[in-house]
Amino acid sequence: MKKMLKVGQIVNTHGIKGELKVTSLSDYLERFEELEWVYIQGYDEKYYIGNIKYRPTTVILSFEGYDNINIVEQFKGKYVLIDESQRRELPEDTFYKADLIGLDGYTVEEVYLGKLVDIIQAGSNEVYVFRDKETNKDILIPAVKEFIPEISLEKKRITVDPIEGMIE
């Protein structure tokens, strides 16, 4: 099966003409304009994007052939997905969250921290959550260059340069 990426979550219907209110999971709100079609979690078919409207915190989407609220209500709560062929090319040193989850974290001194299990949005920065499988302890590291000097998808690892007291 293809690896799918979440680009939004359908939070509700909008009006009676089959429009859906979607919370974008992309840093690039206009992402949906680049897509001809998407998948919906739990369904195998492609859904071709009709209209796109922007609201302050959401995107209003409609799909071709889905012009009635009764048809689209089943999608509430589902994720809007794309396959890897639809990925945008990212700038250097920028990564998809889905590619980072599961990478091993090591300090610059080669001390194993655990696997990256979550990425939390905390204000203007993200925070990486590493979990040590043996102790089940979470270690939170701000995802800034000062503390994360290297990420290697090829080596499947993230290098952390913590300050004193950050990891204990």
UniProtKB/Swiss-Prot annotation:
One of its GO terms (biological process) is rRNA processing. It is found in: Cytoplasm. SUPFAM superfamilies: PRC-barrel domain, Translation proteins. One of its GO terms (cellular component) is ribosome. It comes from the Bacteria. HAMAP family: Ribosome_mat_RimM. Binds ribosomal protein uS19. This is Ribosome maturation factor RimM.
